[in-house]
Amino acid sequence: MSTGKESSKAYADIESRGDYKDDGKKGSTLSSKQHFMLSLTFILIGLSSLNVWNTALGLNINFKYNTFQITGLVCSSIVALFVEIPKIMLPFLLGGLSILCAGFQISHSFFTDTQFDTYCLVAFIVIGVVAGLAQTIAFNIGSTMEDNMGGYMSAGIGISGVFIFVINLLLDQFVSPEKHYGVNKAKLLYLYIICELCLILAIVFCVCNLDLTNKNNKKDEENKENNATLSYMELFKDSYKAILTMFLVNWLTLQLFPGVGHKKWQESHNISDYNVTIIVGMFQVFDFLSRYPPNLTHIKIFKNFTFSLNKLLVANSLRLLFIPWFILNACVDHPFFKNIVQQCVCMAMLAFTNGWFNTVPFLVFVKELKKAKKKKEIEIISTFLVIAMFVGLFCGIWTTYIYNLFNIVLPKPDLPPIDVTQ
């Protein structure tokens, strides 16, 4: 990893500029090797920071605790807005996630059922806080680099879901189905070992490829007038389009998935567990695939995958059409809406637009800012986007309960009475 020092120097050069404006890759001082190592670093951070949570979900560890995890994400990102978290904390936060992984393994093997359940509750909250802080720091660093790395961070987050999903399926073929406290014992052990290895890799790449120090703090203090940033309200007005798009895409996704599709689809049409696995897999795979094209717009066939925030807002408005589509798939007893292929297409389109529209704002928001130019201002706006993403997820998971107020699940057919006289 010989590019580590050179990459850190390149990043330090960007930090030392009085004004910051990302104009794409034109004029980049980073070599292709440095760019590759940095992109791989941010992919690993995104992947490893979400693996712990995705593994818990994949093992079906008390899904209701998901709401606590989302709450932790929101709280941590808001704290990061008002309290400057040192960049050097990034590898320590990733290390904290690896300790939580070991905690799942130890508590599942040696604790009682009640103690394990209590650990899971506490761990989900801590995962939200720690992962939220790690992602906020990483997005701040990536979005203010010479070559915007925010898109690669988003890509890493997308990889996590399909990565854990595929490993889960492979382990089903090789490990014992024995369960302990309702959770597969062998799968929990191996999945969290993989999470720990990913986190260790991410820590190594962070330390070697990123400048996590604040070398220019003294210079910044000496030039307070030059470094005076715009107020939060001015920064919000300058970036409200990106903030709104981040909120909308995440709110709609978590409102519909998995609460309506696949859960209410399964209740209405008695979908088999195998087909449910396929439907969920469609979400994981297409969410993963859609996060890459926006990062590859230098390739001709992908050049139209990034566009202005105005167009993205229009696209998010059109995305609301998924609401009636998902509801019809649950409440209509017709071969078309019961068809597994149609359901997979519906889920794939929701997932593809989710990953795509989550990545674009981090890539284009800097270019559309009118007032914000300084690196510190870009970092604050990047934190705004992370908060919008987490608040969108939080609102989505809570508003999905609205559909319980309406009878969109088809009634079960009445069974013929049993003749007890025979």
From Swiss-Prot:
The effect annotated for I418M is: No significant effects on affinity for hypoxanthine, inosine, adenine or adenosine
Q: Which residues bind inosine?
A: W53, Q135, D287, R291
Q: What happens on changing S48C?
A: No significant growth defects in adenosine-dependent proliferation assay when transporter expressed in purine auxotrophic yeast strain
* InterPro entries xrefs: Eqnu_transpt (IPR002259), MFS_trans_sf (IPR036259)
Its predominant location is membrane
**Record note on what altering L385I does:** No significant effects on affinity for hypoxanthine, inosine, adenine or adenosine
- Write out the catalysed reaction: inosine(in) = inosine(out); adenosine(in) = adenosine(out); hypoxanthine(out) = hypoxanthine(in); guanosine(in) = guanosine(out)
Q: How does it sit in the membrane?
A: Multi-pass membrane protein
Q: Which UniProt keywords apply?
A: Cell membrane, Membrane, Transmembrane, Transmembrane helix, Transport
What ranges does the Extracellular topological domain annotation cover? 60-63, 108-116, 175-185, 266-274, 331-338, 398-422
Q: Which residues lie on this side of the membrane: Cytoplasmic?
A: 1-38, 83-87, 140-149, 209-241, 295-309, 363-374
Q: Where in the cell is it found?
A: Cell membrane
Molecular-function annotations in GO: nucleoside transmembrane transporter activity
A GO CC term assigned to this protein in UniProt: plasma membrane
Q: What happens when the gene is disrupted?
A: Parasites are not viable if adenosine, inosine, guanine, guanosine, xanthine or hypoxanthine are present at concentrations below 50 uM and require higher concentrations of hypoxanthine, adenosine or inosine to progress beyond the ring stage of development. Reduced uptake of hypoxanthine and adenosine. Reduced parasite growth with xanthine as the sole purine source.
Relate the outcome reported for changing F36S: No significant effects on affinity for hypoxanthine, inosine, adenine or adenosine. No significant effects on affinity for hypoxanthine, inosine, adenine or adenosine
Query: What's the effect of swapping T136C?
Result: No significant growth defects in adenosine-dependent proliferation assay when transporter expressed in purine auxotrophic yeast strain
Upon changing D287A, the result is: Abolishes inosine binding and transport activity
Phenotypic consequence of S317T: No significant effects on affinity for hypoxanthine, inosine, adenine or adenosine
Q: What is its biological role?
A: Sodium-independent nucleoside and nucleobase transporter with a broad substrate specificity. Plays a key role in the utilization of host purine sources by P.falciparum during intraerythrocytic development enabling parasite growth in the presence of physiological concentrations of adenosine, inosine, guanine, guanosine, xanthine and hypoxanthine. Essential for parasite transition from ring to trophozoite or from trophozoite to schizont stage but not for erythrocyte invasion by merozoites.
Further information:
With an efficiency similar to that for uridine, can mediate the cellular uptake of nucleoside analogs used in cancer chemotherapy: fludarabine (9-beta-D-arabinosyl-2-fluoroadenine), cladribine (2-chloro-2'-deoxyadenosine) and gemcitabine (2',2'-difluoro-2'-deoxycytidine). Unlike the mammalian transporters, can efficiently transport the anti-viral nucleoside analogs: AZT (3'-azido-3'-deoxythymidine), ddC (2',3'-dideoxycytidine) and ddI (2',3'-dideoxyinosine). In contrast to the human transporter SLC29A1, has low sensitivity to the inhibitor nitrobenzylmercaptopurine riboside (NBMPR).
Name under which the protein is recorded = Nucleoside transporter 1
